[in-house]
């Protein structure tokens, strides 16, 4: 599929994440039309009306509430529908309830837009990305999850505050599960190509291992901290999704830590969906990058994959 003009996207679910994503996409010239689909159609209508009014102040874009049939012609299906994570819950606690929602809704949506890419957002996103791939019959490159794109941004944010450097000049990734077993890749983190420890030494300071442990903890716990305080995460994930969508529609070939189905990589036996740095363009996932990991990162990634595989095995797919 070649590079195309402004596209139509379908947003399934108009909760905090779905509506925040729609709002973020109002500012993207790459999106010309958005259809909002929700089991609560009145809620979708209200969100669409509000967004359509806002669009008048930004640029011409068509926003409306629809049914599955109205998803016809969509370039990307953004699946946010699902039960929200509550305070004290892990993302994995949502597995059976949200798997049932994906199984019920996604096939009908794709019936009307069989050429679309699927961007899974609902949690647990890695498992639901795998479920979406399995039940849709789509090739692996066309079923993506938001993965650890936001986690990687959180990692860079915390590093930027510590090192007092623009986060756009920090290269650092979080891989594996979007959740409790995620793996910050410290061995490759750098500022403009300069290893973090060397960068710190330039100021005559020495980095302590305790610092890395604390930053890793903060990245992992960030969503829980936000949910405890405001009940939901929305803005960060909405902009992470906007970034992924623009990367696809602009055919950027950018490196993003999306979740997708992989098999037999990094010593992981069998198949699983998890996040790794991938080239992303208008075909979806174009390539999974084989980044060099140190032994403990490889072990942590394998543990993350095994955790996800054990949970997937509990589902009848």
From Swiss-Prot:
Name recorded for this polypeptide: L-lactate dehydrogenase
User: Which residues constitute the catalytic centre?
Assistant: 178 (proton acceptor)
User: At which positions is beta-D-fructose 1,6-bisphosphate bound?
Assistant: 156, 171
Give the family per the record.
Belongs to the LDH/MDH superfamily. LDH family.
PANTHER family, per the entry: L-2-HYDROXYCARBOXYLATE DEHYDROGENASE (NAD(P)(+)) (PTHR43128), L-LACTATE DEHYDROGENASE (PTHR43128:SF16)
Q: Which GO terms describe its molecular function?
A: L-lactate dehydrogenase activity
Q: Which residues bind NAD(+)?
A: 17, 38, 43, 82-83, 121-123, 146
Q: Could you tell me where this protein is found in the cell?
A: Cytoplasm
The function of this protein is: Catalyzes the conversion of lactate to pyruvate.
Q: Which residues carry this modification: Phosphotyrosine?
A: 224
Assembly mode:
Homotetramer.
Enzyme Commission numbers on file: 1.1.1.27
**Could you state one GO biological process linked to this protein?**
lactate metabolic process
Binding of substrate: at which residues?
Answer: 85, 91, 123-126, 151-154, 233
HAMAP family named in the record: Lactate_dehydrog
Q: Which InterPro entries match?
A: L-lactate/malate_DH, L-lactate_DH, L-lactate_DH_AS, Lactate/malate_DH_C, Lactate/malate_DH_N, Lactate_DH/Glyco_Ohase_4_C, NAD(P)-bd_dom_sf
GO annotations of cellular component type? cytoplasm
Q: Which UniProt keywords apply?
A: Allosteric enzyme, Cytoplasm, NAD, Oxidoreductase, Phosphoprotein
The organism encoding this protein is: Moorella thermoacetica (strain ATCC 39073 / JCM 9320)
Q: Which domain of life is it from?
A: Bacteria
Pathway involvement? Fermentation; pyruvate fermentation to lactate; (S)-lactate from pyruvate: step 1/1
Q: How is its activity regulated?
A: Allosterically activated by fructose 1,6-bisphosphate (FBP).
| Catalytic reaction(s) noted | (S)-lactate + NAD(+) = pyruvate + NADH + H(+)
């Amino acid at each position: 599929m070649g590079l195309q003009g402004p596209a139509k996207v379908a947003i399934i679910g108009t909760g905090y994440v779905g509506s925040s994503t729609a709002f973020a996409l109002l500012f993207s010239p790459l999106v010309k039309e958005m259809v909002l689909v929700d089991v609560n159609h009145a809620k979708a209508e209200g969100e669409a009306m509000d967004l359509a009014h806002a669009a008048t102040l930004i640029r011409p874009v068509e926003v409306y509430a629809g049914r599955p049939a109205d998803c016809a012609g969509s370039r990307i299906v953004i699946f946010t529908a699902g039960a929200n994570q509550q305070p004290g819950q892990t993302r994995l606690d949502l597995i059976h309830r949200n798997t049932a929602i994906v199984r019920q809704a996604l096939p009908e949506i794709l019936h009307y837009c069989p050429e679309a890419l699927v961007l899974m957002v609902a949690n647990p996103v890695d498992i639901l990305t795998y479920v979406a791939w399995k039940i849709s019959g789509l090739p692996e490159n066309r079923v993506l999850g938001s993965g650890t794109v936001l986690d990687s941004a959180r990692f860079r944010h915390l590093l930027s505050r510590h090192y007092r450097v623009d986060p756009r000049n920090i290269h650092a990734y979080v891989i594996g599960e979007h959740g409790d077993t995620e793996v910050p890749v410290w061995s490759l983190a750098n500022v403009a190509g300069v290893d973090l420890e060397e960068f710190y030494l330039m100021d005559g300071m020495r980095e302590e291992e305790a610092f890395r442990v604390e930053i890793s903890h903060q990245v992992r716990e960030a969503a829980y901290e936000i949910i405890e305080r405001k009940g939901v995460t929305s803005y960060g994930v909405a902009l992470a999704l906007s970034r992924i969508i623009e990367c696809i529609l602009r055919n950027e070939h950018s490196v993003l830590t999306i979740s997708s189905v992989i098999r037999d990589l990094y010593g992981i036996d069998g198949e699983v969906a998890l996040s790794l740095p991938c080239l992303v363009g208008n075909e979806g996932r174009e390539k999974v990058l084989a980044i060099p990991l140190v032994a403990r990162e490889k072990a942590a990634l394998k543990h993350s994959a095994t955790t996800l595989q054990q949970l997937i095995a509990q589902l009848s797919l």
